[in-house]
């Protein structure tokens, strides 16, 4: 259960998806996932410039701080009821009074615990200030997801997505083929496993 982390995000509002909807669906999912996971990480919709127009057209919006606190209070109570730890991902809002801490989605402490070794990591400097993740290498790439979610910040435009052909599952690349002019460069990596002995 420790190796499985449930994410409930992005939390956004519309005529259909109101606070009551999120409270009900969160409880339904928590009941189903209880015992299979120990933690749920939530995040509220972020207004990235490239998604604003699509959100507005679809009638979707983020939550005010008051709405965030009201929903978080209900979700926190539900999480406790089902034995789940609730944390936020890269959120400035402080919800410790509701029993909700800040998460590290790339959590060096958890990774060290499940792999039974201590890891020497640093905070990922390429993320937002509120992000607590350890430095990592993302295996994804921008402008490659064909799902077309309105709230997705990873694609620049629907028009650009239409130009992507379906990926080849045998290709070493995410959504195309290696061309003769392409240059493949191996990345220099260092092991994160600490070799330093611990006294306690």
Predicted regions and their residues:
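Local cysteine-cluster metal-coordination motifs and their immediate loop/turn environment
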Residues: 137-157
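Active-site/pore-lining binding-face segments in mid-to-C-terminal subdomains
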Residues: 72-81
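Conserved AdoMet/S-adenosylmethionine-binding subsite of the radical SAM
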Residues: 1-72
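Short Fe-S-cluster ligation motifs
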Residues: 158, 162-200
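Helix C-cap/helix->beta junction micro-motif
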Residues: 36, 81-82
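Acidic carboxylate-rich catalytic motifs and surrounding loops in phosphoryl-/glycosyl-chemistry enzymes
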Residues: 10, 43-46, 84-97
């Amino acid at each position: 259960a420790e190796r499985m982390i449930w994410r409930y995000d992005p939390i956004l509002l519309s005529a259909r998806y109101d606070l009551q909807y999120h409270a009900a669906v969160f409880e339904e999912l928590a009941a189903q996932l209880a015992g299979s996971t120990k933690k749920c990480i939530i995040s509220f919709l972020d207004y990235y410039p490239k998604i604003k127009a699509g959100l507005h057209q679809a009638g979707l919006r983020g939550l005010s701080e008051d709405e965030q606190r009201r929903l978080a209070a209900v979700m926190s109570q539900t999480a406790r009821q089902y034995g789940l730890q609730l944390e936020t991902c890269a959120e400035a809002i402080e919800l410790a009074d509701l029993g909700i801490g800040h998460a590290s989605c790339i959590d060096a402490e958890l990774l060290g615990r499940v792999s039974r070794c201590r890891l020497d990591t640093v905070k990922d400097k390429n993320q937002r200030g509120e992000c607590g993740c350890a430095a990592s290498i993302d295996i994804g790439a921008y402008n490659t997801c064909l799902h077309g979610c309105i709230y997705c910040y990873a694609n620049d435009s629907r028009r650009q997505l239409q130009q992507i052909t379906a990926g080849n599952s045998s290709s070493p690349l995410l959504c195309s083929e290696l061309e003769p002019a392409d240059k493949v460069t191996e990345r220099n990596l260092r092991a994160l496993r600490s070799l330093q002995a611990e006294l306690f």
